[in-house]
């Protein structure tokens, strides 16, 4: 039954776009705790985690309904988040729910060991009975509590899993033949991972369909979201998840792109060197999430995290937070954000004071101030039509099956650190080309390739799950597109049991079917350039990993792409540089690349406020070095400089009032943090009162920009500011 449902969902060619009319939530965060003054970051909404909290919580657990009330009483919109693959579900595993033990439903590796998320918290094989439990004991309860937005996070099946009795039963139901050990052949690996992917697609469909139906009985329009890592990260971490196929589910209203330092610091190869490239990886991860959902019109939140799961030092957190934060803002079509996960961990946790020290401390005041300036900028960050600087129109094709070939490994196939993907992306990204990704599963959607001039693709590391995609690719080339196919097609996954070699099809490779659609009928296409209709395709018989695992070995790909881009793409010259810039309203973003065409810094000039400096200085000129990023407020672009306004602040501004020569507001932010604000005024203040005390200081007034720098201790109760000039 699952197989029939999954196939029907995968073959849907149209998507249900969910209008977010009147949606009041632009910023959100997740917390398993009740409201506390130390974590009151003033986003629009809070996703209260788990009816039983977070399994890793060590403190006393407050009942779910009490946690909800505590946040509502402070003015927050309350949503719900829990894990679909793991969670505080001991009542299910130990038999308290239905009288039967279910620990045997955990994901199991080849050694027979259960894969645990925490104590008594296994990663789950999502059986029908487990889904019944999730619906009855969790989804129903939160809807009864009046919550109309449900976030089911991280539908994850480990690639190394696949040996439990529960999984073997699901295999038999899905494929109709007995389970096969995935480590014994590439085909078994592919089939095993394909099933894992289908199981969680089905799980989310079941749970969300129930949530919407039950909500209707209560007169509620329940929205359902999936917080998920990117396809790139799951592939690198050897985890299988539904990813792009979630777009085929009408019951999914949106997503959270779970990208942060922890995912983006996974090393990759470039120019023969494997190392962390946090900014570049984050840029590609956010891009994969945007392209996965853009054709659907559904809501997408981008996540950043000021720290990460792995314990490191505060300086490391700050540097990489700035890199990921800048990367997310370089997507001007996305303007909704999860500003942080687990504020209780960020504000109250203890982390190293330096990389060489074992001494730990809570978040330094300078970093909490900077972080709050950054997250409060997200409350005002506009969606814009502006473009990231650089030559546009180069895209890389992705498919969900990228996750299927990662593990177990087999003779004849090696893809170190996902090099077959990064081999197509990094040679361009490192030269300042803002490459995009396109998802094979979305090709049926109108305009999926509208912004693509040259499409790079490879079946070395992934395979097409349906033949229909090839018709869309062929039609796109026929109408003038340029396709570069880059693969030897010699990997052992070419011959796995799939549509291209079953049901009467006898293609040795899936690419044979694609090239046949474009007029080649001689089996394995030879390297070279071919014309089809108004377009061109080029077959390059190299696996993309060769361009990055070896030093100075990407020139052939670069030259070929440049030649076709300029001759056939109708896009002018392919520009190489060592930076990206973007303008979003009054905000300026700059990222300068290392390992690029130049080591020159990028110079900015103007009247700027540096948001990555907790002192919010006025900057008139700055050189940004390679491997550095910056975010500025450009005062020169403020539309109405006679209007008093807070341009940057480490608190959220409420109740603004401006009459004549007076401006007042209330600032709110967590206790035990320091606020700094730069305020634009028509004239120099004569009086500046903070909570009934005169605090004006001549030294804090900048005559040229007509801005005042104000500092005080934050309070979640609100600090009242009254200015006269």
Predicted regions and their residues:
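The substrate-binding groove and active-site-proximal loops of carbohydrate-active enzymes
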Residues: 47-59, 115-135, 185-203, 228-230, ...
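Aromatic- and acidic-residue-enriched segments that line the glycan-binding/catalytic groove
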Residues: 87-116, 153-184, 239, 413-414, ...
């Amino acid at each position: 039954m699952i197989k029939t449902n999954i196939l029907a969902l995968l073959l849907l060619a149209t998507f249900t776009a969910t209008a977010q009319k009147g949606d009041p939530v632009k910023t959100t965060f997740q917390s398993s705790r009740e409201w506390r003054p130390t974590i009151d970051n003033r986003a629009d909404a809070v996703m209260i985690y788990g009816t039983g909290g977070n399994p890793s919580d060590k403190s006393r657990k407050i009942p779910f309904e009490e946690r909800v009330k505590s946040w509502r009483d402070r003015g927050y919109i309350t949503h719900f988040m829990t894990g679909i693959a793991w969670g505080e579900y001991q009542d299910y595993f130990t038999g308290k729910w239905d009288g039967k033990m279910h620990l045997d439903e955990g994901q199991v590796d080849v050694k027979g060991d259960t894969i645990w998320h925490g104590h008594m918290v296994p990663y789950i094989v999502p059986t029908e009975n487990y889904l019944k439990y999730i619906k009855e004991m969790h989804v129903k309860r939160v809807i009864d509590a009046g919550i109309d937005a449900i976030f089911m996070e991280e539908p994850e099946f480990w690639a190394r899993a696949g040996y439990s009795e529960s999984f073997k039963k699901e295999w038999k139901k899905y494929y109709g033949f007995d389970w096969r050990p995935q480590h014994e052949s590439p085909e078994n690996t592919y089939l095993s991972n394909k099933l894992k992917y289908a199981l969680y697609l089905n799980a989310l469909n079941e749970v969300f369909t129930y949530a919407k139906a039950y909500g209707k009985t209560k007169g509620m329009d329940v929205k359902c979201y999936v917080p998920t890592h990117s396809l790139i990260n799951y592939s690198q971490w050897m985890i299988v998840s539904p990813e792009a196929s979630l777009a085929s589910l009408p019951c999914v209203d949106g997503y959270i792109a779970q990208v942060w330092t922890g995912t983006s610091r996974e090393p990759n190869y470039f120019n023969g060197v494997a190392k962390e490239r946090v900014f570049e990886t984050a840029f590609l991860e956010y891009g994969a999430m945007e392209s996965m959902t853009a054709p659907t019109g559904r809501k997408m939140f981008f996540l950043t995290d000021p720290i990460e799961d792995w314990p490191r030092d505060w300086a490391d957190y700050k540097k990489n937070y700035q890199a990921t934060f800048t990367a997310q803002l370089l997507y001007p079509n996305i303007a909704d954000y999860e500003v942080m996960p687990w504020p209780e961990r960020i504000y109250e946790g203890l982390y190293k004071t330096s990389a060489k020290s074992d001494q730990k401390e809570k978040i330094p005041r300078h970093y909490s101030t900077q972080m709050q300036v950054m997250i409060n900028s997200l409350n005002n960050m506009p969606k814009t039509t502006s473009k990231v600087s650089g030559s546009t129109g180069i895209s890389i094709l992705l498919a969900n099956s990228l996750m299927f070939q990662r593990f177990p490994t087999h003779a004849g196939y090696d893809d170190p650190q996902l090099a077959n993907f990064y081999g197509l992306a990094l040679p361009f990204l490192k030269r300042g080309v803002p490459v995009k990704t396109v998802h094979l599963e979305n090709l049926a959607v109108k305009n999926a390739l509208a912004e693509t001039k040259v499409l790079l693709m490879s079946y070395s590391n992934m395979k097409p799950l349906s033949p229909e995609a090839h018709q869309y690719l062929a039609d796109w080339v026929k109408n003038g597109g340029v396709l570069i196919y880059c693969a030897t097609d010699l990997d052992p996954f070419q011959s796995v049991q799939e549509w291209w070699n079953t049901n009467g099809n006898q293609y040795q490779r899936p690419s044979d079917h694609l090239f046949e659609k474009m007029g080649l009928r001689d089996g394995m296409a030879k390297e070279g350039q071919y014309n089809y209709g108004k377009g061109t395709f080029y077959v390059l018989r190299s696996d993309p990993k060769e361009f990055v695992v070896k030093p100075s070995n990407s020139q052939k790909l670069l030259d070929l792409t440049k030649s076709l881009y300029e001759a056939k793409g109708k896009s002018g010259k392919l520009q190489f540089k060592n930076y990206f810039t973007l303008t979003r309203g009054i905000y300026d973003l700059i990222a300068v690349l290392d390992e690029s065409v130049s080591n020159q810094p990028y110079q900015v000039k103007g009247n700027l406020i540096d948001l990555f400096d907790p002192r919010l200085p006025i900057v008139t000129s700055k050189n940004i070095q390679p491997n550095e990023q910056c975010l500025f407020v450009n005062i020169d672009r403020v539309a109405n400089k006679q209007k008093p306004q807070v341009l940057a602040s480490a608190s959220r501004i409420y109740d603004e009032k401006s009459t004549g020569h007076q401006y007042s507001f209330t600032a709110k932010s967590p206790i035990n943090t320091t606020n700094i604000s730069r305020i634009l005024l028509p004239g120099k203040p004569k009086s500046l009162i903070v909570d009934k005390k005169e605090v004006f200081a001549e030294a804090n007034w900048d005559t040229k920009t007509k801005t005042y720098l104000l500092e005080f201790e934050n309070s979640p109760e609100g600090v009242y500011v009254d200015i006269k000039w």
